[in-house]
């Protein structure tokens, strides 16, 4: 049974064992989760179906107002998130960033359209707190970390019409204007387009081409005298999902901006902001996995067909088992990145590992979120295809998670960079998996052998990929997929080993079940003990209750 004040029966014990301080926030997270899965979930459904944001260009007197109107429920909950400290706690109370990543994971189970602006606001807070000049930090940081219901929300403006990932080709120009800059250009895809503060990439006049010529600038929505800044929202995007999130095209018409970093540092700082956002993307993807599993399980436990509830049928059980084990693997992978983010705040020696694990986690969890939401919709059937059930929204919203903050090919290129000798990424990856291998108990020989074989295969795959430029370009994405899966398996093995020493064999069943997905046994030769073991996890009362709300 679920312990009182448990925010997640699977993740909570793992997080508190890795970061004991997280036990202090158990009740706070449990209350946050209850609010998210009731009030926020209801708002998300309402906003998605009936009250998405709208662009108001002129007021009733014909004056240009150029503002985005969101419904009051969305707006109130957006501010309530900041009031609850989803951005401010690490700065106001010195909480670990891991706490706010856990809050993001819970929030994503109900509303990705709120999780996105929270992520962007957090990225701005991080850049201001760690890299902005003292005068800029003192003037603007409080605006995004305050917890009194008056916080300004954030945006990151990098994508231009020529493409999102090729930031080095930025055409926005930053012209010096006294102690500030005037930005001219078009930002093509701006999430949370009604943000109070945004960071934008731009090229100062006379700067060289490419990413080395980019500076990073803070763009307030309003000037010091209260007048709107000099930019125009051209339109709101009509999107497949995240209907509650205002995403726009913004013309910068001499927008007043404050320099955070000149070239060549500007691009580097935007990439650090992306690191933060990619971790949130990963935990948000796992939130979608978790909610999809809950909806599928609740339906399977109650829906009857051909005289039996769906959950009694082996084919349905197989699908639920796969969803459960992939959720566990995704959760460990995403929060491995979240923990690494906090470690980097203590020592820069962990930055290569942060970048590497974040690329792996961002890629694989986003893929799995789509698989999980699609599986939930298929299991619920025709009802799931309607807006009366949340799985349709989950599926639509999940699609963007592979695109936000860099698609798979971009993560693969990041992996290639980190595996180069300069960064020692392969050595750190191998050391992490070898460390798990060395600590596995003697009674887990099967898992130990499987992980050792997996690491040997990773070594060969990396050698082939890195042998020359053509191989790197051909195999980078396949290597990304393989290493992400291997790391997820290693984390499952690590958790299983710790549980085994406490007399709990269920995590070992999950790890073996996951391994059988990576290296399928002969037809009909699946480990039935592992299958029965994971089935026990589907009896978790708390998990079933989510889907019944």
Residue spans for each PLM region:
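Conserved phosphate/anionic-ligand binding catalytic regions in large, soluble enzymes, centered on
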Residues: 112-119, 282-285, 289, 367, ...
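Extended, charge-enriched "interface" segments that sit outside catalytic cores
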Residues: 1-93, 543-549
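C-terminal helix-coil-helix/basic helical segment that borders enzyme active sites and/or dimer interfaces
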Residues: 328-362, 377-378, 463-474, 494-500
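A glycine-rich, basic-preceded beta-loop-alpha segment at the flavin cofactor/substrate interface
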Residues: 225-230, 234, 239, 246-277, ...
